[in-house]
Amino acid sequence: MASEVAQGRTHEELPRVLTATNALAIVVGIIIGSGIFLVPREMMAAVGSSRMVYAVWITGGLLSLFGAMSYAEVAAMRPRVGGEYAFLHDAYGPLTAFLYTWTWTMIAKPASIATIAAGLMRVLGTFPVFAFLDRAAVGHLMWSQGLAIAATWLITGLNIVSTRDSAQVQTLLTWLKVAMIVVIAGMCFASVKYGDWHNFSSGFQGARGGFAGFMIALIAALWAYDGWSDVSQMAGEVQKPQRSLPVALIGGVTIVGALYMLTNAAIQYVLPSAAIAAADRPATDALQLVAGNLGAGLVAVGMAVSIGATFVGSSLSGARVPFAAARDRLFPSVLGQIHPRFKTPWVSLLLQAVLSSLLLLAIGKFQALFSLAIFSEWLFYALTAATVFVFRVREPDANRPYRVTGYPVVPALFILAALVLLVFSFMDRPRESTAGALVILCGVPVHYLFQRSKAPGDKASDYVEQ
């Protein structure tokens, strides 16, 4: 089934203003947020040894790379706004595309943005001037929640005003944080006084261990790698997408994997396993030991810059999904509006900010938020990666600027790993996973009610060829 927009469709489209450099920076910038600084403790506490932590980082990196390679093939074939939404619609039809859009819009992206905002407040709380963040502001509302909501709206405003300027800000912040990561790692390795290569073979008692421990650590690692798919949602705004998207997806994940391994090695060179497992902020503790308050301050600034880049990019890309669905009449048409002056999907961006703010008010906790986001995202990661097989069978002669290396093994391994993660998520965090599943299932009646409520001649099938 082809899903090209019908020829009679004449409405304005988003302009292609993003360069290949912007696309690469979006991938790197969105992935490297707070994860590398906040999850090493969770990983070490789960697996209990430096070697197992490396095994988790490598496994998570390879899975993300396999997913990026699978997405690259489809994105280069179909460089449309909405990314995964468009791929799922073309492969499986409007119901699956609606369920993805519903889940993405109502839970996955708002939970992801709320997690980023909560992580930023966690970082700012390390500065004495922000010590008040852990106190109540009004009633049960914490200052950290209030400022996280304010930051969400500030970033949303930036993204509404200009896609090009937002991308340039995000690109600048991305390369700045890459430079700071290299400097931080270099300072650790330069510390002859505190560094110890024996730390890499150390372990500690008390870790959960076993398969359960490995999976808990892997979920944390995958959250740290999360975001590599977001650039596909802006495929319709990327210049020369057939070349730019594969380079951005595969190159971005590779760069991030190298930086994560470097950072993890730097921390472990300075801190033994037991110290990492006990530390709320292992990178900060390592630099505090090496360079005192100056080092700890450098890490905090680096984390703030890092999360800022993720914040801008994640908010920028996320709103393209409901925008694309609205343009195909699968979502309320108001979400498909383009701002007459700024040429951005401003209504979708506003909705995204509202839902993210509500999640921050309702939950506000870092751990619960990333558990909520991981489940729903990985279900649709698996379905989207599977479109590689669908299109290979259905359209064997289609032009493919990039073909996934290692087909069919690479996409199959990614899909299998995603399914294992989904099962484990239900076992380890049943409440959050059940909530995610219920949101998806609620989309089925919503889809049919929405289609029935529209006037004859205004159905999605009248605008999109099946």
Regions found by a protein language model. Give the residues of each.
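Hydrophobic alpha-helical segments of multi-pass membrane transport proteins
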Residues: 181-184, 322, 373-400, 417-420, ...
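Hydrophobic transmembrane alpha-helices that form the core helical bundles
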Residues: 42, 65-152, 157-160, 303-324, ...
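Membrane-interface loop-to-helix entry segments
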Residues: 124, 143-194, 208, 249, ...
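Flexible loop linkers connecting adjacent transmembrane helices
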Residues: 4-8, 12-14, 53-54, 70-98, ...
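Helix-loop-helix junctions that connect adjacent transmembrane segments
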Residues: 8-14, 50-54, 131-143, 175-301, ...
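Membrane-interface "cap" regions at the ends of multi-pass membrane proteins
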Residues: 1-41, 45-51, 58, 64-69, ...
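C-terminal membrane-solvent junction of multi-pass transporters and transport-like membrane proteins
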Residues: 334-346, 381-432, 453, 465
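TM-loop-TM module centered on a large, flexible mid-protein loop between adjacent transmembrane helices
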Residues: 86-88, 93, 125-135, 204, ...
